Amino acid sequence: MAWSITNKADTSSFTKMAEIRAHLRNSAENKDKNEDIFPEDVIIPSTKPKTKRTTTPRKPAATKRSTKKDKEKEEVEEVVIEEYHQTTEENSPPPSSSPGVGDIVESVAAVELDDSDGDDEPMVQVEAGKVNHSARSDLSDLKVATDNIVKDLKKIITRISAVSTVLEDVQAAGISRQFTSMTKAITTLSDLVTEGKSKVVRKKVKTCKK
């Protein structure tokens, strides 16, 4: 065990060895445990260097990957097409013995046109049938509409005729009343002209019974 004297203590006042020994003994008993050269209880911190966290790069979007893959596929397809053209040009016979590419293209186009014309004929027939069917359906709808209109007009005519007959009856009754009143007036007038005075009608006087 190592002994040490610190500068904090003032040793100028010690005159005897016994006092020095007592002071050393007290300092040894009251000293901090961490002052030992090889302390057992003190935990020595690790001296590992601090490592920074590595930030993982974000994954690119799926669209970018798809575009890259599409580009790679296109490049591969272009390379394959170029190789195929090169091999066909190398293995193809001279133009005198085989028909030209333009002739082949023209023949294929002519065949496609013939096929398209043949396919167009039934399509035209189908469209004509559709037009005829639509025209017939339109005519049938128009006929139904006209029939309904005629029925409604007939109903209106019957109602109007009924109203007119009722009005004629009322007017006839009024005319007959006016005619009767007119005839009464004419008779009174004729009596006044012929007799010169109106007829006196004696009224019976009611007698009260006692």
Curated annotation (Swiss-Prot):
It comes from the Viruses. InterPro entries: Pox_Ag35 (IPR004966). Residues 25-102 are annotated as: Disordered. The keyword Metal-binding does not apply. Its main location: virion. Residues 25-36 have a biased composition (Basic and acidic residues). Belongs to the orthopoxvirus OPG110 family. Involved in the co-transcriptional or post-transcriptional endoribonucleolytic cleavage that generates sequence-homogeneous 3' ends during late transcription. Involved in postreplicative transcription elongation on intermediate and late genes. Also involved in DNA replication and in multiple steps of virion morphogenesis. Required both for inclusion of virosoplasm into crescents as well as for maturation of immature virions (IV) into mature virions (MV). This is Late transcription elongation factor OPG110. The gene is OPG110.
